[in-house]
Amino acid sequence: MSTWNLLLKHEDLGEESKRRIKATLNKTISLKELELAVADGWVEKKRRKRTVTVEKSKALGDSFEDEVWTAFYRMGFDYMNSTNKFELSYSSSNPALTKQIDVIAMDDETCLFVECKETDKLDRTKQWKTDLEAMYGHYKGICDEITSKFGRKKFKYIFATRNYAIGQTDLDRIRDFNFAFFDEDSVKYYDGLATHLGTAAKYQLLGSLFAGKEIKGLDMNVPAIEGKMGGLTYYSFSIEPSKLLKVAYVLHRNNANHDLMPTYQRLIQKPRLKAIQEFVNQGGYFPNSLIISIDSGGHQLQFDKANTQVEDSVSRVGVLHLPRRYQSAYIIDGQHRLYGYSGSRFESTNCIPVVAFVDLNKEAQLNCSWI
């Protein structure tokens, strides 16, 4: 049977996050237990009158798993596993058949499963055919199990490793199974991103995992003004931050790379982001528009002109149908203002002004960013 009691809401995972974020295991025991604890690998850290605090290194694999779990926790997913004993049934006919899940992270639209593998020394020979094929065989079943309890979602299985050099055959197998692969650099990248951006990092992760995929049920139709400027067509509109966050991105590359963190830190400055988040949560607002470039996906954007127009005006009013795809809106200017709404109580009730161009090339994007 699935161990649903070990799948908790984000607000109920505070104590687990404190344990996972520590580099070592710690506990307080009585003095009479100290000798046995030392024999078991624990090291005395602080002695008191009747008790003593001891610590020891986490077991191989646990530290990496905790690092991955903590990164996803910082991103603010709605549900996560509270321990590594969480299991999901993969057989509707025999619920007793289960698969242990190292990390599960879920929100209202997506569900991510992560399997973590770590070794203490670099291993260039390990083959993962059996492990990957076993997961692929269980994958539909565990997705169906989640769907039966939480409804339809977008799923992604992530195979995360540390100190393993994955061969091309296994990388091809991961791609063919529509899985994702994170090496230690990818994990460091997303952990750093979560530390830097907080809950806003989730949208960059999901955008990378599901780039170009439709977000079903997302209403992206907005009242808009169509205008002309510099030989380009643009649209001016207002939209809820919660909607734009789901389709927006700030870096063109999809591959997670720890070397990209300085670029993120330049584009989105943590002190400024924090200040804007506090300003927004206090009821503050920004009247100036975000500037974005919409990726049309090779299709002309639908703009339904209103029946009533102003005569002799270049502008037109109507309803703009924005793409409902991950990574379909590149943020040229206004990153802090947008991501400042992430996790805010106003992210679904406020509207922010936007000026949107369509399929701008990089040179044109640079021209917009410094104006």
Give each language-model segment a name.
Residues 147-154, 284-286, 347-349:
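Short helix-terminating capping/connector loops at secondary-structure junctions
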Residues 1-216:
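Intrinsically disordered, low-complexity Ser/Thr/Pro/Gly-rich regulatory segments
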